[in-house]
Amino acid sequence: MEPAVYGCDDNKINSNTVMFRLKTLTILGSKAELASLPEGKLLINTINAHSFNTAKKDQLFAEALTNGDVLIPDGVSIVKACKWIKAKSQPKERIAGWDLFSFEMEKLERESEELRTKSEESKIVMFMGSSQKVLDLIVKRAAEVYPHLKVVTYSPPYKPEFSDEDNKTIIDAINAANPDLLWIGMTAPKQEKWTYSHWNELNIHCHVGTIGAVFDFFAGTVERAPIWWQEHGLEWLYRLMKEPKRMWRRYIIGNSLFLWNMVKE
């Protein structure tokens, strides 16, 4: 299967109505295909049952997921549903946001280490989103795990909607950093919609991943499910058990809604 790349055209903003269906989405097939993604400016989003349900009632979010360059299946439910409904894409496995993060960071670390041996400048990775406290923890851990990378951060204002001035400040900060890898972490669907809406204003030439929860996982402020739960497709159940008050609606009601949406497809 070829990498699920829609194309690297910067002109992503499209006012046409999107008919959002899992059956017709182009989704990356396996973790191995991450190595085949083209270089340059590339928008990488994730999809799971929750984000699918949200996109069904949020037109801009649906456009962001449909018109991005790469869509990865961050949920066993997506993998199984694609098989069940005989979708165009047949992903072989779940690719978590953490898998994307680890792959991209390790790749950039190797490239940066090689540059450092030649006395050249380090590669730059930028984290845009979350609180300054979390970002400080990210910088500290990155220095230990990825010592050859230069880490730049930006914590946007904590508000439901950014003003035009806020957006300009964020965009200017990203463009000034000119990163070799950019992570956007503001939770879904805000992070996907913001990145998609301002894509043409980002004068950068790197992979851009929207991976909200990974910021907290890497910083250590939120515990990720143990490996056994991940390998058996039960990370959602682990999160539900850890945070039942916050997660019950997303997983109990949300998973039922996702199943119903698949029946309708």
Locate the predicted segments by residue.
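Short, flexible loop segments at boundaries between secondary-structure elements
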Residues: 156-161, 204-241
